[in-house]
């Protein structure tokens, strides 16, 4: 399929599956904005570029949360802590605008767009539902105000779309065991080409060392035994960097990845008291697809290279 064709197909797919009403949307050729309630959600496809010899289009998903947030060290610390519980999006501060938004992205290619569009759909749905549920409480915690905006023709949407209640479906699907089973996790150890120095697996868990610094590898972890506090079963993914924990670096990584990532951004950079500076995300059971865990391993490996180049450009 031609590049422009699959971009248009992905946007049509997301619009249809999210059941977006035309009257509450603004459509453009490679983007759309819609209002499920008072918070705008934007979906757009960035211009084409080449990455490792492959033509790539990045599909971004972003939902407004707060405006008027003071950009202080306290804000960085709160965001770095909040992002420890990320599912498929990051809380990202836009410093010049004093705004906090939810953001995620997927990398689209002619070979992967069918899988990528589906995980993008889940990121879009969870983002929209989380924004609806959390915005008022976050405004109080971070000192800003809810970034409610009107549709340019319809005005402010007073009655929320039924889709804002979609979290219940994810919660129900997460009541059972993870669909990422032991055989699937064990099989990842034998991936070729190998993206790591060394990898091992336990029941439902994978751990691998990735090149980062000469004697300090980064750590990739997948854990299908982990359960999300709200969504239940699925797959926890982590990328731990061998660096001192720093709230501002976590914000820098999230902000830069929201501009031009080299891999799927399905989660967030954060600071954890035990694990330090890391990227984390959670794939809920309802988002399971064959081949997804394999793709995530390679995207986490690419994310590691991207972070190393950003933080140590001369290295």
Predicted features, each with a name:
Residues 1-44, 84-99, 103, 111-117, ...:
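Charge-rich, low-complexity N-terminal segments
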Residues 3-7, 11, 72-76, 178, ...:
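Generic alpha-helical secondary structure
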Residues 28-30, 34-68, 204-240:
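Hydrophobic-cavity lipid-handling domains and compact docking modules
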Residues 58-99, 229-280:
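Short, internal acidic amphipathic alpha-helical interface segments
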Residues 65-69, 106-110, 212, 241-243, ...:
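Beta-strand elements of well-folded, non-transmembrane domains
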Residues 90-125, 136-140, 264-297, 309-313:
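Well-ordered alpha/beta subsegment
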Residues 125-132, 301:
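Generic structural signal for well-ordered, non-transmembrane alpha-helical segments
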């Amino acid at each position: 399929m031609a590049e422009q064709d699959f971009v248009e197909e992905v946007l049509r797919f997301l619009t249809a599956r999210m059941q977006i009403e035309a009257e509450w949307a603004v459509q453009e050729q490679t983007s759309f904005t819609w209002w499920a309630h008072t918070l705008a959600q934007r979906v757009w496809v960035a211009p084409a570029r080449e990455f490792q010899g492959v033509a790539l289009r990045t599909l971004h998903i972003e939902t407004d949360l707060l405006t008027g947030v003071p950009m202080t060290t306290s804000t960085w610390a709160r965001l770095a802590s909040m992002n420890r519980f990320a599912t498929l999006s990051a809380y990202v501060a836009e410093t010049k605008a004093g705004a906090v938004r939810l953001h995620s992205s997927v990398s689209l290619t002619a070979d992967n767009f069918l899988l990528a569009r589906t995980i993008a759909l889940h990121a879009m749905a969870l983002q929209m539902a989380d924004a609806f549920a959390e915005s008022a409480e976050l405004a109080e915690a971070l000192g800003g105000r809810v970034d409610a905006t009107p549709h340019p023709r319809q005005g402010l949407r007073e009655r929320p779309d039924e889709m804002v209640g979609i979290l219940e479906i994810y919660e129900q699907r997460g009541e059972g065991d993870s669909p990422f089973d032991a055989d699937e996790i064990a099989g990842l150890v034998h991936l070729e080409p190998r993206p790591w120095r060394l990898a091992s697996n336990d029941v439902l868990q994978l751990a691998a060392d990735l090149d980062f610094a000469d004697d300090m590898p980064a750590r990739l972890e997948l854990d299908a035994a982990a359960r999300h506090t709200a969504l239940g079963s699925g797959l926890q993914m982590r990328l731990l960097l061998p660096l001192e924990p720093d709230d501002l670096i976590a914000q820098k990584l999230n902000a830069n990845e929201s501009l031009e990532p080299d891999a799927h951004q399905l989660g967030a950079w954060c600071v954890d008291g035990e694990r330090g500076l890391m990227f984390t995300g959670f794939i809920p059971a309802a988002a399971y697809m064959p081949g997804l865990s394999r793709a995530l391993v390679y995207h986490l490996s690419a994310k590691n290279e991207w972070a190393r180049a950003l933080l140590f450009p001369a290295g």
